[in-house]
Amino acid sequence: MSNVTLRKMSPTGNEMKSTTQGTTRKQQDFHEVNKRRTFLQDNSWIKKRPEEEKDENYGRVVLNRHNSHDALDRKVNERDVPKATISRYSSDDTLDRISDRNDAAKTYKANTLDNQLTNRSMSMFRSLEVTKLQPGGSLNANTSNTIASTSATTPVKKKRQSWFPPPPPGYNASSSTGTRRREPGVHPPIPPKPSSPVSSPNQLRQDNRQIHPPKPGVYTETNRSAERNIRSQDLDNIVKVATSLQRSDKGEELDNLIKMNKSLNRNQGLDSLFRANPKVEEREKRAKSLESLIYMSTRTDKDGKGIQSLGSPIKVNQRTDKNEKGRQNLESVAKVNARMNKTSRRSEDLDNATEVNPKGHENTTGKKDLDGLIKVDPETNKNITRGQSLDNLIKVTPEVKRSNQGSKDLNNFIKVYPGTEKSTEGGQSLDSLIKVTPERNRTNQGNQDLENLIKVIPSANKSSEQGLDEHINVSPKAVKNTDGKQDLDKLIKVNPEIFTNNQRNQDLANLIKVNPAVIRNNQSQDLDNLIKVKPSALRNTNRDQNLENLIEVNSHVSENKNGSSNTGAKQAGPQDTVVYTRTYVENSKSPKDGYQENISGKYIQTVYSTSDRSVIERDMCTYCRKPLGVETKMILDELQICCHSTCFKCEICKQPLENLQAGDSIWIYRQTIHCEPCYSKIMAKWIP
């Protein structure tokens, strides 16, 4: 017993001695760190020798001696020593033992300290086991149990030892004993009770596995799977979904549908469908409007119940609605084989088609408008039960009177080749207009406006309530027998098809390469403007209809071999020739009502002389818009002016500046070219 008592007392003294040494070392290290920090802050480590102070780049040279990963606050010999960092354990003696393991004396002290501490802890375990297993047992039995447990824990000691860095020579497995000393803090306070005096290593390993808390990885995966299940229920897939249009009781507009197949249900506006094959649903009982479709083969609704608008198709094979009960507006179709609506009970608007073989519809019981066709093989309507009148007008300013339920006036036509109309029982007139100024046709029951017709060859209507006008090289068309309100828009280079069997008012607006119109019916229909067009406002009300022409002053659309038209807001100079025209390439944006894109004339634009040769803006005169060729030219890049020398003039007094020689002066003031007299006048205003 005395031997055991000495064992318990001796480690206490060594423990206190080692603790004092560890505390002293920590204080010394702390002071050294402070010294090094101050050493770096005052840059004294750079100025080592007087000769080094003379070199202004010495600090940079010193820094280049070190690698980027080196710690500058340590000594060179300390940098090369690998340090083992263990974040799992934080006791003072363990850190001191690992950091100072090169010192044999300190290592020996740490080993003796750990061995004595281990003996003390084992004596504590032994006393616990004595009280539990053999309360009345002898010391020899306790000793045997202690030896058995020590030998039994040897496999665990090897297992724990693998967690540490490899020990240096002379290191007597103190790290594993240190870890066993800390096991009561990690494990439950009472060690597991062995089932036999000598327990097997497998049983101890099994107990260790049971004592250790569960791994955090399993818990994390369980939480992640639970979160994934919860989130997967609240996540909606909104990508790559085919959209369908909603139904509403009032007008809706759908803009810019590209490469899509859409269907419209009620009161919807479909704007500018590009490269699409749309099918519009039928069964509409109220007014519909079909808007311009571009590069499309469109089929419009049948038996519609609400208002629909389908944009005007360009280069389209178009079929319009049949058996409609509401009003419809069909805008002009360019390069289209159009088929118009049949047997509609209320007012409809049908637009002209360009380069189309039209078919005329017969047996109409209501008011209809047929527009003139340009370059068209028209078919005229026959079997007319109402009065018709045939007027031949040659180079005449005629006025045609129509005896319908509402009187109509057809105003001045100038230089006209008339088309004849036959078998008329009542007043109907078909007007052929060539090189005509515009006119407005208004009926008493419903006012009608007839837009300007330019360069038109008319065709006659035969034996039908509807007039079919054939126009060759024509902008305009004539308005025909209608009991109510009708508007007929200008058509240029169009072969339209006209649809009959309407019981109510119909509006047929042909808008091809034209200033297009926006048609608004009694049931609020919107007809969108066509691209490459100047819009004219077309409004259908119960009383009066106004068809406004927004063409340029000459009411003239310049023709291009490539089919391009001049749609600029204003021209920079005189009217373009037929050979060279300015073309504005517009983006494929959805056209809005009254939409017109203003493009500045200073950008490089493409113009076409022939179909196979393009000329850029620099090859064209800025003022006269003719090719520059090999003549003398004036180029001012800052003002983006490139013109003939004969066209170069003072923009104030219009004095030609073509005879300028070396040394002559021109003045540019506020982006405007001034000759010397004009600029001197401006200079005089500055001087008081």
From Swiss-Prot:
SMART domains, per the entry: LIM
Protein location: Cytoplasm; Membrane
UniProt keyword annotation of Cytoplasm present: yes
Entry-linked PROSITE patterns: LIM_DOMAIN_1, LIM_DOMAIN_2
PANTHER family on file: SCIELLIN, ZNF185
Chief place where the protein resides: cytoplasm
GO MF term set: metal ion binding
Function description: May function in the assembly or regulation of proteins in the cornified envelope. The LIM domain may be involved in homotypic or heterotypic associations and may function to localize sciellin to the cornified envelope.
Residues annotated with Phosphoserine modification: S289, S389
Positions of region (Disordered): 1-29, 134-231, 340-373
CDD domains the record matches: LIM
Biased amino acid composition, Polar residues: 1-25
Residues recorded as bearing N6-acetyllysine in the entry: K83
Compositional bias annotation for Basic and acidic residues: 358-373
GO biological process, one term: embryo development ending in birth or egg hatching
InterPro entries: Cell_Prolif/Cornif_Regul, Znf_LIM
Keywords: Acetylation, Cytoplasm, LIM domain, Membrane, Metal-binding, Phosphoprotein, Repeat, Zinc
Tissue specificity remark: Highly expressed in esophagus. It is also expressed in keratinocytes, amniotic tissue, foreskin stratum spinosum and stratum granulosum, hair follicle and nail.
Region of interest: 16 X approximate tandem repeats: 251-563
UniProt name for this protein: Sciellin
Extent of Pro residues compositional bias: 186-195
Sequence repeats: 251-266, 267-286, 287-306, 307-326, 327-346, 347-366, 367-386, 387-406, 407-426, 427-446, 447-465, 466-484, 485-504, 505-523, 524-543, 544-563
